[in-house]
Design a protein with these regions (language model features):
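Aromatic/pi-system hotspot detector in well-structured domains
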Residues: 56, 107, 216-218
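A broad, low-specificity signal marking well-ordered, structured residues that form hydrophobic/aromatic
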Residues: 41, 49, 88, 187, ...
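Active-site-proximal loop and beta-strand segments within enzyme catalytic domains
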Residues: 1-53, 60, 69, 77, ...
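Juxtamembrane helix-loop transition sites at the ends of transmembrane segments
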Residues: 34-37, 89, 105, 154, ...
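Loop/turn elements at helix/coil->beta-strand transitions in domains of secreted/extracellular proteins
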Residues: 4-5, 86, 219-222
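Generic structural signal for secondary-structure transition and capping sites
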Residues: 12-16, 40-41, 84-88, 149, ...
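Catalytic loop of the DD-peptidase/beta-lactamase superfamily, centered on the K-T-G motif
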Residues: 19-20, 27, 64-77, 81, ...
Length: 276
């Protein structure tokens, strides 16, 4: 039997990315859910990792069934409002209504071109339906670091940030890197150790023309959020480049700006298209 914990830890046992193709085809969430009984199990629930979008979004149905409030309303009231995430919202309409929204861009082979924002992933809010500014994400980062205990208690954070199911580097979408180990998935978060430090928490996001990365370490009280309305390939190295710079900063007596300049690449290397 699949539990809420299985859903949140991507360990339902179902075939990975079940019906993500139907999300891409713009099929409604309700229609997709009715087909989930056709999806095969690759292991018993809790026994293996398999990333999901549609299956993860069943969390929203659980919230609605237990609170009488839809997922969007529940998160707005319990998270966005108390954390003062003033521009955070759900849905394509809210995104387009924000006068300062960033338009997505894709690489054509010679230049970046603006592309259309679609409804596809907005149909599964728990997995991919949130809009937020960098200021909003800063508040979310601080809450994850334990600075908003009324909203996210220490016990809640500890449970979210603890390993539930082990993952391989490939499953975690990490390249081999010296010092990287103990990759796992908690409740909605990827987890890893790096170098001498344990307990890093991470997740990235991608929809056409947009990328995001958020990583932090509660024990070290450090973290980063990066949002871009494009698809630069350097995003794949961003988290670990940041950690290398952070480690050097901790060990060095040089000013931070000197270290940062050392990490900058020539302009021709800074932005290249993401391969498909």
């Amino acid at each position: 039997e699949i539990s809420l914990k299985h859903l949140m830890s991507q360990s339902s046992g179902l075939m990975p990315h079940a019906y993500t193709n139907l999300v891409e085809d713009n099929m409604s969430y309700d229609r997709i859910v009715k087909r989930l009984n056709r999806v095969d199990f690759i292991c018993a629930p809790g026994e293996c990792y398999g990333y999901q979008n549609v299956v993860f979004s069943l969390v929203g149905d659980v919230v609605a069934a237990n609170t009488g409030v839809d997922y969007e309303g529940f998160v707005t009231r319990k998270t966005f409002e108390p954390l003062n995430m003033a521009r955070a919202s759900f849905g394509r309409a809210a995104f387009l209504d924000d006068p300062k929204h960033a338009r997505p861009h894709i690489w054509t082979g010679s230049h970046w071109r603006e592309t259309r924002t679609t409804d596809h992933y907005y149909r599964i809010p728990p997995a991919a339906g949130v809009n937020a500014s960098i200021e909003d994400m800063t508040q979310w980062l601080l809450a994850q670091l334990g600075h908003e205990p009324v909203v996210l208690s220490s016990d809640m954070l500890s449970e979210m940030h603890s390993p539930v199911i082990r993952t391989t580097l490939r499953q975690a979408h990490y390249k081999r890197r010296r010092g990287l180990g103990n990759t796992a998935y908690g409740l909605g978060w990827r987890l890893f150790d790096y170098g001498e430090d344990a307990g890093f928490v991470h997740h990235g996001g991608y929809v056409k023309g947009m990328r995001s990365e958020m990583m932090f370490n509660p024990r070290l009280q450090t973290g980063m959020v990066f949002l871009t309305n494009s698809e630069p390939s350097q995003m794949n190295n961003l988290v670990f480049d940041f950690l290398d710079l952070y480690r050097e900063f901790r060990q060095s007596s040089e000013p931070a700006i000197v270290l940062m300049n050392r990490y900058q690449k020539p302009a021709s290397q800074q932005v290249t298209p993401v391969g498909r």
